């Protein structure tokens, strides 16, 4: 109880927000240079993904986010997910009734390159 009281004294408000965590969040929010860098990398990665998806005959949904949905045509999204996982690439499998749609996040450029490398191999395997 004494230790819990001591630790609790560093919280903020009813939600027990940690002061150090709040300070870090505010600093991150105000770091405009990092925000610009992050946005640039998201756009770069998204463009790489869009090109790769189209080059492999798939149809991406238009997006302005850090992820995209890809229409796999007649291919099953869960089979695609499992094969991509074997290639050390994590993507979203089937979501609700969308059995032929895959969701991929931008991630780091190295991760995007891994997706691009694995994509044709996996498509050949499950086609």
Where does each model-flagged region fall?
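Short, solvent-exposed alpha-helical surface patches in well-structured domains
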Residues: 5-6, 79, 114
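A generic structural signal for alpha-helix starts
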Residues: 2, 33, 75-76, 110
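PLP-dependent aminotransferase class I/II
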Residues: 1-53, 58-61
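Conserved PLP-binding catalytic core of the aspartate aminotransferase-like
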Residues: 42-47, 51-87, 106
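PLP-dependent enzyme catalytic core of the Aspartate aminotransferase-like
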Residues: 82-87, 96-127
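Conserved alpha/beta core of the MobA/IspD/sugar-nucleotide pyrophosphorylase nucleotidyltransferase superfamily
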Residues: 63-65, 70, 95-98, 111
């Amino acid at each position: 109880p004494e230790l819990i009281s001591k630790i609790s004294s560093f919280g903020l408000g009813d939600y027990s927000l940690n002061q150090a965590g709040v300070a870090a969040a505010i600093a991150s929010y105000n770091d405009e240079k990092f925000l610009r860098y992050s946005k640039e990398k998201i756009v770069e990665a998204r463009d790489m993904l869009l090109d790769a998806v189209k080059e492999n005959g798939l149809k991406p949904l238009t997006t302005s986010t850090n992820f995209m949905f890809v229409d796999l045509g007649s291919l099953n999204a869960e089979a695609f997910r499992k094969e991509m996982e074997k290639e050390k690439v994590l993507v979203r499998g089937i979501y609700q009734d969308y059995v032929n749609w895959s969701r991929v996040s931008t991630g780091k450029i190295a991760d995007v390159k891994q997706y691009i490398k694995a994509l044709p191999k996996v498509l050949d395997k499950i086609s």
